């Protein structure tokens, strides 16, 4: 009824419902701006067009953040494939606390680069930072919150404050034990997968031997 009353029509780009969403967000933004506040929301806000001063949190990959930055809107990068800490830290899910799914090892978190190369230097100025998300539908205790966050939070910190040319995962691993000592002092519950020994087995059919790479 509201769509009809406002005379909103869909087109090839967006549905009428998406345009109604944009209308509501723009109305809400004006109210908040009048109170000295700014609006911020997930990248679904792009559907139907953004309100003028919106800040976008890009969680469905990076495309929403890229689109918003090209429109000169502030962006916080939060792609689920790199920064959703409610994903499992190990593939051995049978021995892990229950999680929503997915797989996000600390190495992948560390590898994230929040400045898309598809943006110009001027457009990159609208990327204000990154954010990890930890939804707690499957997390009943604060101790498990710590487990899901640590030490992935340390990798997130370096994503934010280290320039790409200076990032070095091997060096990060060398420094991590010092931080883990702090975790121990405060009795934080942290995951230890990063310290596991990973072995690759390569059979040699010619002589029946087995190469093991650690």
Where do the language-model regions lie?
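Active-site neighborhood of glycoside hydrolase catalytic domains
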Residues: 1-55, 59-72
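Extracytoplasmic/secreted proteins, especially bacterial periplasmic and envelope-associated proteins
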Residues: 20-23, 27, 148, 152, ...
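Acidic/polar loop patches that form or flank catalytic/metal-binding clefts of enzymes
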Residues: 33-43, 75-79, 163-169, 191-192
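Polar, glycine-rich mid-to-C-terminal structural blocks
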Residues: 37, 52-55, 66-109
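Structural recognition of the beta-strand scaffold that forms the well-ordered cores
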Residues: 39-42, 55-58, 74-78, 128-133, ...
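Active-site lining segments that contact anionic ligands and/or coordinate catalytic metals
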Residues: 51-53, 72, 125-129, 209
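Substrate-binding cleft of secreted/luminal carbohydrate-active enzymes
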Residues: 79-89, 100-173
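Low-complexity, disordered linker/stalk regions enriched in Pro/Thr/Ser/Gly
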Residues: 180-214
